[in-house]
Amino acid sequence: MLTKFETKSNRVKGLSFHPKRPWILASLHSGVIQLWDYRMGTLIDRFDEHEGPVRGVHFHNSQPLFVSGGDDYKIKVWNYKNHRCLFTLLGHLDYIRTVQFHHEYPWIVSASDDQTIRIWNWQSRTCVSVLTGHNHYVMCASFHPKEDLVVSASLDQTVRVWDIGALRKKTVSPADDIMRLTQMNSDLFGGVDAIVKYVLEGHDRGVNWAAFHPTLPLIVSGADDRQVKLWRMNETKAWEVDTLRGHMNNVSSVMFHAKQDIIVSNSEDKSIRVWDATKRTGLQTFRREHDRFWILAVHPEMNLLAAGHDSGMIVFKLERERPAFALSGDSLFYAKDRFLRYYEYSTQRDSQVIPIRRPGTPSLNQSPRTLSYSPTENAVLICSDLDGGSYELYIIPKDSVGRSDVVQDAKRGTGGSAVFIARNRFAVLEKSTSQVLVKNLKNEVVKKSPLPIPTDAIFYAGTGNLLCRSEDKVVIFDLQQRLVLGELQTPFVRYVVWSSDMESVALLSKHTIIIASKKLVLQCTLHETIRVKSGAWDDNGVFIYTTLNHIKYCLPNGDSGIIRTLDVPIYITKVSGNTIFCLDRDGKNKAITINATEYIFKLSLLRKRYDHVMSMIKNSQLCGQAMIAYLQQKGFPEVALHFVEDERIRFNLALESGNISVAVASATQINEKDHWYRLGVEALRQGNSGIVEFAYQQTKNFERLSFLYLITGNLDKLSKLMKIAEVKNNVMGQFHNALYLGDVKERVKILENAGHLPLAYITASVHGLNDIAERLATELGDNVPSLPEGKTPSLLMPPTPIMCGGDWPLLRVMKGIFEGGLESADRGGTVDEEDVEGDWGEELDINVDGMENRDIEDILAAAEAGEEENDEEGGWGLEDLVLPPELDTPKASANARSSVFVTPPQGMPVSQSWSQKSSLAAEQAAAGSFDTAMRLLHRQLGIKNFTPLKSMFLDLFNGSHSYLRAFSSCPVVPLAIERGWSESSSPNVRSPPALVYDFSQLDEKLKSGYKATTTGKFTEALRLFLSILHTIPLVVVETRREVDEVKELIVIVKEYVLGLQMELKRREMKDDPVRQQELAAYFTHCNLQTPHLRLALLSAMGVCYKAKNLATASNFARRLLETSPVDSQAKMARQVVQAAERNMTDETKLNYDFRNPFVVCGSTYVPIYRGQKDVSCPYCTARFVPNQEGNICTVCDLAVIGADASGLLCSPSQVR
Amino acid sequence: MSAMGAGPDHLFNLRNNFYLGAYQTAINNSEIANLSPENAVERDCLVFRSYIALGSYQLVISEIDESAATPLQAVKLLAMYLSTPQNKESTISSLKEWLADSTIGNNDTLRLIAGIIFMHEEDYNETLKHTHAGGTMDLYALNVQIFIKMHRAEYAEKQLRVMQQIDEDHTLTQLASAWLNLAVGGSKIQEAYLIFEDFSEKYPMTCLILNGKAVCCMQMGNFDEAETLLLEALNKDAKDPETLANLVVCSLHVGKSSSRHLSQLKLSHPEHILVKRVSSAEDNFERAVQLVA
């Protein structure tokens, strides 16, 4: 049982779940009805109008209403939105036990100790039917969820099923007059609209509860005889099916589970029991120490139950709903029902992999808790709570589409948790001893390792590492080094989510998310008020997580925010761009598209990717107070400026970011004294005296203005101000200005005008303005003040300004980094926005700023790294190594070594087996048996000249082994490379050597040979064709068909070699035109590709035509025309033909008769006409005049002409 | 060596780096505090063996003086043997002398070094005389290699099984099983590949790991991937003999010219087995021509 929420209160007698919201009503023995939000754990409201206990309470399924019934005989209908009781239904004559709304009609059914059941219409607020028949208290009554039935239970030991079909008809067709008449009659006599259909007898004591099955014709009841009975009904009768015994006291309440095939009951014996509804066996029992249970409620939609007891109530789940899943690259493995399933993200394909439980096995709380997957071995570890924690290991068959329903015999074991730590190793936690067993895929223990802390769960933490969890901390433990790599105090961690690069980890607790580095260095902590459910890392290093009702994000610095709200909890499996993949509680995969703009924006800010920030500002609709507040709070008021329309906020942001020009614009718009003043202050701070002046002018703050003029040395303006003051009759201001200006006469004048004659007199006389002083003295008459004695007056004059006006050197405000970033982004991004005022000097500064920052970061990072290293080093010297006992053992065995041990003889190298088995020359060469290879070639192809083959032999030999550096400082191990490897080749069975030449390479060479021929590079072409000819003896192919192709290739290449040799020869013979013509003519009889033939014909035609052998030339021309050449060639050929027609003669006699078929001798280049004797090369099939026999073939340069040979052997298929 | 002891294994990283061919890293990170005397000797052995693997024989010879422990003396012997092949007779004779000495003859490191030296001499009989009993992971691993060299995979497998019983996840066990898998070939090559793949995921890439993977690829006929891996290895160390040798082989198979790599190998490592094979093959060819003619 998973308790989700608990309350402490008076005895709870009635409970009702809200069908949509996370609310529950609890009616108490004290008369209070409480409305709780069980998700947030808060009391939303309380309704206190009943007198005495309230036993029944029920939410309406669509209206904001609920109904309650109590021991004050009253049924009250409440509106929870208005927090008040709408009306009271009166009629029952004793305690009311239960009340329930009809799911469709405006009805309420109530059961009462007055032995009746009443049905009320809450719209007309009248009782529409009274169901009589029970002869003791009716303890419970409820509508059937679909049909027109009511079930009731009574202390008269019966359960009754009532048919209310007639009542429904009356309501549905009230317009029917005749019906109404009869109904009115029946109303008068009562009981006709609702008749008892079945009376279920079987309980020996009073029945406390009866309930319908939500879909099947079943009823379950619980009674004071401590039994739960299951009843079945059909159209005509109802009968007892079975009895569930187990409760030790009166059964208070019993009902079917809404989704699973189970029955839940509770009792005064202080227990809740869960029963298998099919097998009718007890599955689970939950006990409370002191509290008797009184009531039970099932949530209509979700997997939730609630039970009321003596001192409160609990909301609980019977089992977890989180599907176990494991992520691997693009695929997700998860457990659903009794199958392991597979989901591919890219295709969103979902398929069943293997069954993991036999059908019909009890499922409650045995479903997989965690899943761990090893991609290379295709193995899955499934952990469940079965037997106090156990695991099963399945190897998924290769053809895993396994539709079959046969459950594999999994390898099992017990252990707190089991998780793969390497491709073929998994760790199993042994809680009792706090050690892990490392096992292989055969489920054999490979290693045992004690854990550094008492651990109650282990998680993957990179290959060979484990993350161990205890109550209050987690550690990462390296199993091989037996070292603790990192440690972190945390609340109880439930889930661990690694980023894809394994650099960061998110530790999810019930209400906390902790982000840490791979060494468990804390990066940030987030607290949530609602349960944290799941999470995954996105590609940018943002952690996306879900709570019960939100999808949220967490940036690396710990800033978090809501992405969207959720109706039902989901479990995120993967985040990819804007898509969140998740599993819901039904185990269905879903892809949710989210708007990632906000967190990507914040992330860019955080990472100082101002170009991104800028483009996002330009392209997306980011705004809102929250964003502005965020920017301000994070110290980016200048960015916020871009979002704001409101002038006041703009002004504030501008001031904050020191952007005076924006501030001036805003201040002008606002035009309020306070704003001007603040602008003045900021401008003054920056030293922008022009703006200060402007601001002071706007606010007419003359005093400040005059002081400003004084310190800026702007005497003109100062005297102007003095005049203004005079006009405005501001004597004080005037005097100040005069003082600032050092204008003594003016001061005397002001004092005089203001009537301060004595002061004026003193001022004048001190400054030596004697005439004025005298005048004033006369005016003063007797009252001439005496000048102070003994003091030397000094002239009070402000210093003359050296220069005046203009701004002071401006303070560089924090405008710094960001503006620079923005502007440069502007420049980089959009070329046409050239109007950005570039201030290069400033920009330079900014860059420096940026650099500094980065430097500092670097230094910090370096410092951190240094610290880490130090830490590590500190970690080394903890304790001395305990030497393993093995160190001593070898001595004993070593002593015995020389006597017993006999060195085994050396085995056979692979190359030897090659040379033993093969009759292919190439394989012999690769094996290094050059002599055998040569003998084979000699026998098969008559080859005698091996010199051209030398490099092939060496290459084959050199390419036959790779080199493995095994043990340090030891000789390397050469490894024979074999041909035709496949996954299924069995070990220790030797295949023939892999050869460096293959047929496809020759094809390539042939093509380049053709190309060289076309372009007239005859030497190059000849080299290529010859190399083909030289390689073929050492090529091995697999099939017969390829053998034929190889043989064809020999002939093709031979023709070209011969032809090209003749052509090259022809070019040497510049001085022998006859021979030239002959060779050109023979060339045209080599079997060439049509384009090459055309060229050969063209050249032969040209040579002959020039030599005036017109008849022969025209023959070539005709042959050329037959090949349908390009126009230019055709034109030339036609001209030759025409020229020849006029004069069909040959100037010189050639040894060339084109009418008579012939082959050309490979060395003498003379035609061998059909019927003449010849000899041929056993390898390349070139033909020779008989006297060449015994020589090395001049075409292939390999074989002896006329030698005996068995023929080319180039495939194992020929040998078989 | 490392059975199921408790307590952290201080030399783990050092050993690992050494086995996986990260010799410079091993040397650089050899300052480990609070080592027991035995561990300190083992540490020094590993460091000096790393120097030997890097070819710094003289450094080892001059650093280890007369007073050093037996294992270190043995290591010095190896350095002497490898540095001056012309004097190897005297080195071997002093080695034999030490082996005969009952007080030090059974020293694991001495036996290991003896095994390595006799293996260079291709005297497997003598080699196995000293190593066959095993005793340390190093010795077992050496035995595996000896038997592979002798083409006796079944014996190698027995040695490997002993290693697996001691510690299946030990780096040397994994390496040795990769060697054996490669030697027996067939479907086992894939397992060897996975082992090297595991290493490359767990530890920094070294030429040894890259070459291991490349050799697996070549054995599986996947020469293109092998070439990529080898070029990566070449980037790490342009003079690594195995990288060059395997590149020669690989280039031949992908139809590219191998002569540059071969000449480089001939220049930097004239004693390499491939160089020897090439020159012997040339002689062999001429001889065969004579024979057949």
UniProtKB/Swiss-Prot annotation, chain A:
Gene3D superfamilies the record matches: 1.25.40.470, YVTN repeat-like/Quinoprotein amine dehydrogenase
Gene Ontology process terms (BP): endoplasmic reticulum to Golgi vesicle-mediated transport; intracellular protein transport
Key words of the record: Cytoplasm, Cytoplasmic vesicle, ER-Golgi transport, Golgi apparatus, Membrane, Protein transport, Repeat, Transport, WD repeat
Localization: Cytoplasm; Golgi apparatus membrane; Cytoplasmic vesicle, COPI-coated vesicle membrane
Repeat positions for WD: 7-48, 49-88, 91-132, 133-172, 202-241, 246-285, 288-326, 363-404
Listed GO CC annotations: COPI vesicle coat; Golgi membrane; nucleus; plasma membrane
One protein family per Pfam: B-prop_COPA_B_2nd
Stored InterPro entries: Beta-prop_COPA/B_2nd, Coatomer_alpha_WD-assoc_reg, Coatomer_asu, Coatomer_asu_C, Coatomer_complex_subunit, G-protein_beta_WD-40_rep, Haem_d1_sf, TPR_COPA_B
Domain of life (superkingdom): Eukaryota
GO molecular function: structural molecule activity
Its membrane topology: Peripheral membrane protein
Broad class of the protein's primary localization: cytoplasm
UniProt cross-references to PROSITE patterns, sorted A to Z: WD_REPEATS_1 (PS00678), WD_REPEATS_2 (PS50082), WD_REPEATS_REGION (PS50294)
Assembly behavior: Oligomeric complex that consists of at least the alpha, beta, beta', gamma, delta, epsilon and zeta subunits.
Function: The coatomer is a cytosolic protein complex that binds to dilysine motifs and reversibly associates with Golgi non-clathrin-coated vesicles, which further mediate biosynthetic protein transport from the ER, via the Golgi up to the trans Golgi network. Coatomer complex is required for budding from Golgi membranes, and is essential for the retrograde Golgi-to-ER transport of dilysine-tagged proteins.
Protein name: Coatomer subunit alpha-1
UniProtKB/Swiss-Prot annotation, chain B:
InterPro entries reported for this sequence: Coatomer_esu, TPR-like_helical_dom_sf
GO biological-process terms attached to the record: protein transport; retrograde vesicle-mediated transport, Golgi to endoplasmic reticulum
Subcellular location: Cytoplasm; Golgi apparatus membrane; Cytoplasmic vesicle, COPI-coated vesicle membrane
GO cellular component terms listed in the entry, alphabetical order: COPI-coated vesicle membrane; Golgi membrane
Keywords: Cytoplasm, Cytoplasmic vesicle, ER-Golgi transport, Golgi apparatus, Membrane, Protein transport, Transport
MF terms (GO), sorted A to Z: structural molecule activity
Pfam families (UniProt xref): Coatomer_E (PF04733)
Its membrane topology: Peripheral membrane protein
Recorded family membership: Belongs to the COPE family.
Assembly mode: Oligomeric complex that consists of at least the alpha, beta, beta', gamma, delta, epsilon and zeta subunits.
Job description of the protein: The coatomer is a cytosolic protein complex that binds to dilysine motifs and reversibly associates with Golgi non-clathrin-coated vesicles, which further mediate biosynthetic protein transport from the ER, via the Golgi up to the trans Golgi network. The coatomer complex is required for budding from Golgi membranes, and is essential for the retrograde Golgi-to-ER transport of dilysine-tagged proteins.
UniProt-recorded name of the protein: Coatomer subunit epsilon-2
